[in-house]
Amino acid sequence: MDDGFTAIAHPARRAVIGELAERNDQTLFELTIRLLERYDLPLTRQAVAKHIVVLREAGLLTVSTRGRTTVHHLHTDALAPVRDWLARLPGTEPHPPDPRSDTTQE
């Protein structure tokens, strides 16, 4: 259970998760550039690589090689213990959609 919590403990790792959730299968170079451009995180490739190791060890990422390119894949199933723990906290239940915000036309 602690692996998932450790993995999301650092803001840079949360940014990597968010980035891969939005656009999966990115290279280390792509992630490094997007973390700078979208999250204002000026990390070196070596620093991003270290965060990726933590995410891989927690089961949140896998890596595959396509020719000479290594891409990173997000696996959010490893966050299930974190989601389960949060669900037990009072006030963290998902709220039903507000019917007044329905944008469909009848």
What is each model feature region?
Residues 1-5:
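Short, Lys/Arg-enriched N-terminal segment that forms or immediately precedes the first helix
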Residues 6-7, 11-44, 69-79:
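N-terminal helix-turn-helix DNA-binding core of bacterial DNA-binding proteins
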Residues 18-22, 74-106:
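Amphipathic alpha-helical dimerization/coiled-coil segments
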Residues 32, 40, 59, 102-106:
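Hydrophobic small-molecule pocket/channel-lining residues, especially in calycin-type beta-barrels
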Residues 33, 44, 59-60, 83-84, ...:
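Short alpha-helix boundary/capping motifs
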Residues 52-53:
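Short, hydrophobic-biased segments on the C-terminal half of alpha helices
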Residues 56-67, 73:
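Beta-hairpin "wing" of winged helix-turn-helix
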